[in-house]
């Protein structure tokens, strides 16, 4: 099962007690996956979804909020589409539901963004809007250089409204026009994790974070295969040299190493080719790269001073040509 499927399965089980929050989620699902059309002089609202669980959740919420009948139909796979789709159809009281979910104004004009009640609602409403938008048309790629959480939007107005909801819950999201479609995406790994939690997909967030950390722990070694990148090779040499110096520093100082400096030193030794930023992410609790660099610098300075007092080789003595030739 893909990460996207995992998230949707988890989000479809999120318990929502408040009707206003349920309404915000319904409004977003209908905006991002729905369309309105007149059939036989009556308004019909349809939402085209890729998950039966999401369809059943939408049916339950609408029936509970608006006391209206909702049907869920399975659309079988085709030659060009290998998986089934699920069509949620609202005929009963569709005009009233369209108004109350903010798909149209009271006078019947189509609202292109999100409902004003959602945009100006509570933090929980903003989280529900993102949950609904993701359930409707969201995706999450595997961790990597181009990893992103993305929602395909029906138009620029709805994309901007979703960015606004993200801002209200402390998430930086951006709009982009790709292949003629408006999209909202979140690319920063920390922001993706925070948004997953905000929406209610904490279990999937943990899975995604584990994949990300595992990939990042392998990345330095993989990067070294490309020796055409001179800057990267220099960085790797510097990291290995620093690791060797730290190892020497620990021997010089023995049990006199302060605990917080020892922790930074152990990270440098255990992950010899990782960047300072990567070491910071591996720390518990996490640190900035400047904090890691500062601790390692103080450790080396302390060890070199001790070596000078004892008249023994300092930490630089272990950085040899043979060591660097291995990189």
UniProtKB/Swiss-Prot annotation:
GO terms for molecular function: DNA binding. It comes from the Bacteria. Residues 275-308 bind DNA. It holds the Pfam family WhiA_N. Keywords: Cell cycle, Cell division, DNA-binding. GO terms for biological process: cell division; regulation of sporulation. Gene3D superfamilies: Homing endonucleases (3.10.28.10). Belongs to the WhiA family. Involved in cell division and chromosome segregation. HAMAP family: HTH_type_WhiA (MF_01420). This is Probable cell division protein WhiA. It comes from Corynebacterium glutamicum (strain R).
């Amino acid at each position: 099962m893909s990460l996207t499927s995992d998230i949707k399965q988890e989000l479809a089980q999120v318990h929502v007690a408040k009707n206003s929050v349920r309404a915000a989620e319904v409004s977003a699902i209908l905006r991002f996956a729905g369309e309105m059309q007149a059939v036989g002089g009556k308004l019909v609202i349809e939402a085209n979804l890729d998950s039966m669980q999401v369809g059943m959740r939408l049916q339950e919420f609408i029936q509970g909020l608006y006391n209206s009948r909702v049907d869920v139909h399975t659309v079988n796979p085709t030659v060009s589409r290998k998986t089934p789709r699920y069509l949620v159809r609202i005929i009963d009281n569709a005009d009233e539901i369209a108004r109350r979910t903010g798909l149209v104004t009271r006078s019947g004009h189509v609202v292109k963004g999100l409902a004003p009640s959602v945009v100006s609602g509570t933090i929980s409403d903003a989280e529900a809007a993102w949950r609904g938008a993701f359930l409707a048309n969201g995706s999450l790629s595997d961790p990597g250089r181009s990893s992103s959480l993305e929602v395909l939007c029906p138009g620029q107005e709805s994309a901007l409204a979703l960015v606004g909801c993200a801002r209200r819950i402390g998430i930086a999201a951006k709009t982009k026009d790709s292949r003629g479609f408006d999209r909202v995406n979140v690319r920063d790994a920390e922001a993706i994790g925070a948004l997953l939690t905000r929406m209610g997909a904490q279990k999937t967030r943990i899975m995604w974070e584990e994949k990300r950390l595992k990939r990042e722990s392998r990345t330095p070694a993989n990067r070294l295969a490309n020796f055409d990148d001179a800057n990267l090779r220099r960085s790797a040499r510097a990291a290995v040299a620093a690791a060797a110096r730290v190892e020497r520093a620990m021997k010089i100082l023995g049990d006199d190493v302060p605990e917080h400096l020892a922790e930074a030193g152990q990270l440098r030794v255990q992950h010899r080719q990782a960047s300072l930023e990567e070491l910071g992410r591996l720390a518990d609790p996490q640190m900035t790269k400047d904090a890691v660099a500062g601790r390692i610098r103080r450790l080396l300075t302390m060890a070199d001073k001790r070596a000078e007092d004892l008249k023994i080789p300092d930490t630089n003595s272990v950085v040899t040509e043979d060591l660097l030739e291995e990189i």
